[in-house]
Amino acid sequence: MKQVILILILLASIRAIAQEHLYDRIFFANSPMENSYYYSEVSYSGNSWLKNMSKRLPVNDSVYFTPGNSLEIDYVSSPNGQWQVKLFYRPVRGQDFFSKATHMFMRLFVSSQTDTKQLPAIAIGSKKDENHHFITLHQHISDYKRGKWLTVKVPLRIFQIKDINDVDVILFRQQSNDGKEHIMLIDQVEFLAEEHAPVRSKPILTSAKGYERHIDITWQPIEDSAVKYIKIYRSSDGKNFHPVGIQSTGIARYTDYTDTVQKKYYYKISLLDKNYHEPAASNVVSASTRTMSDEELLDMVQEAHFRYYWEGAEKNSGLALENVHGRRNMIATGASGFGILALITGAERKFITRESLTARFEKIMSFLEKADKFHGAFPHFLNGTTGKVEPFFGPRDNGADLVETSFLAQGMLAAKQYFNKANKREKYIVDRIDRIWKNIEWDWFRKDDSSKFLYWHWSPDQQWVINHKLIGWNETLITYFLAISSPEHGIPASFYYSGWASQSKEAEKYRSGWGQTKDGSLYTNGNIYYGVPLKVGVSNGGPLFFVHYSFLGLDPRKFTDAYCNYFSNNRNIALINYRYC
């Protein structure tokens, strides 16, 4: 029986990998910050030297292979010295599955009078290891020329690495000792396969919209797996175009910051394959920047946040992904509750039609009805294709997450109120929401009848193994509020003070543990921070999401307990945070 279960688990894992988008392992494409690249480390000794900014590589934003920047390695290799650069892999949450790679590729631009033997040596490996197998760089460059972008292609097997997935650093070090200054730029440092499929799609731009200092352009979504990037070109005269950025295939829009008001710009895009070849360009669209009022600025910000949930949703379910540029099939249930609220706002603000919202909710409810639930509660993460639980945080996280469920329920209850039209479609949505809401067994998460707390997690095979009690001040107020309000599975109202706002020794220890202070450990605080009084909150109030998550549905102006009014308390936490920053 155990063998059968193991086989089923392995098959499920294989299916998950097959369904998920495969990323390339990229060590450098662009630096999001100007001046220096955070994920690098520079060192030198003796008479050798390496240009750096606070021991990091400088960023060059004027010469690049793909827009908008590259990394500059400006060095002097002396006989009595040594220099070294470490380029670290930047892990991205949810980028867990990678395409099979056979080579390390890098684009190289040599701007100095440098011979091939004066180029550095290179190695790959783990940050934990001290010894690495270096090879000479020049042996893997064909048709070496200065002043143009060259392709460096090194078979990964040469580096003598047992498991390529363990590689998290690329190293460059001094190879010669001529004592002269040399300058080279590097870009698109990545692990790829040697052979790639050609791009067969044609890009089609659909819109351009101007704001005060930027322009948003959109295109038809790209489904062609051979496409690596969308490359964006801008022109100020409609004739002479130059590249301004690249975009990943999971996003069908780009924001171009021009920093110029009252000017017209033209745009076109092309699709890059993994060899960076560009087939035909798209059609051209144009828009002008314009002066905006404060009201228009706020509308712009709100619509942009709405688009994250509208355009960035998981395709099958219509719900929120855990993060964009992460797993493309993994839904975060709590974030989906926030997304539902954003969708309602979008319809109310006429960003979309009520008909479009209704259609999206029909998709959402069809998915949620069939998705995994445990005593009516949803897991933290769901597979958007199958509706099955995704134990993203480990094997113990394979069941219900009551807090994430409360965030989702908060959104659904708002939708239940919003869909108030006397038609069959909206009434059916309301009925479906009502069934899911009433079936959440909040009282089950007491663990036993003697408990004065709710518990965060429950696992179908390990039960209460995580054993995390819900104790405020944090983001879990809405969980207690909904549990007390439940029409079918309610808990006593006394749990608000015995659980959420508990002043027991256990609760005091919990708060002082994560807060690393006694301030606020009894739920109440009473101190003044940066001139602002704080009635409730651990330390100086904690992260701002504590005042966000529970009050997206609850109106803090109307929420007062024995200790404070939560609009005033939340405002003071925001002021403390502002003054701290």
Tell what function each PLM region has.
Residues 229-262, 274, 280-281:
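Recognizes extended acidic, P/S/T-rich segments that occur
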